[in-house]
């Protein structure tokens, strides 16, 4: 298991990577970050919250379709309930709330989960 510092560094990099990917898509999403979380607000007013949970060594995603807890397993962040990787989960929940297909997150988190 990696050190606390490297875990926090990888989470910082993950949050920045999510923001960077959102900047690349042509969807009007307001992104606010701080206090260990990202809040994505859509035109409809709905939100997705991506938050770090260092005590559990997890990333949590809260969306209209539910709450998802992801843990690192080998080279990926995996959802405990759906089995989805972080990139697949983010593509799905952002697509659902944006009302159009989004594939911006493919591969995100895999390189940072090692």
Predicted regions and their residues:
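N-terminal intrinsically disordered, cationic/polar leader segments
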Residues: 1-114
């Amino acid at each position: 298991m990696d050190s606390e510092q490297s875990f926090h560094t990888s989470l910082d990099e993950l949050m920045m990577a999510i923001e960077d990917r959102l900047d690349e898509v042509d969807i009007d999403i307001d992104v606010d970050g701080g206090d260990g979380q990202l809040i994505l607000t859509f035109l409809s007013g709905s939100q997705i919250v991506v938050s770090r949970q260092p005590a559990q060594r997890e990333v949590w995603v809260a969306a209209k379709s539910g709450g998802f807890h992801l843990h690192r397993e080998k080279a990926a962040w995996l959802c405990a309930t759906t089995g989805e990787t972080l990139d697949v989960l983010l593509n799905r929940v952002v697509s659902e709330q944006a009302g159009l297909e989004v594939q911006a997150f493919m591969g995100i988190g895999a390189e940072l989960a090692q």
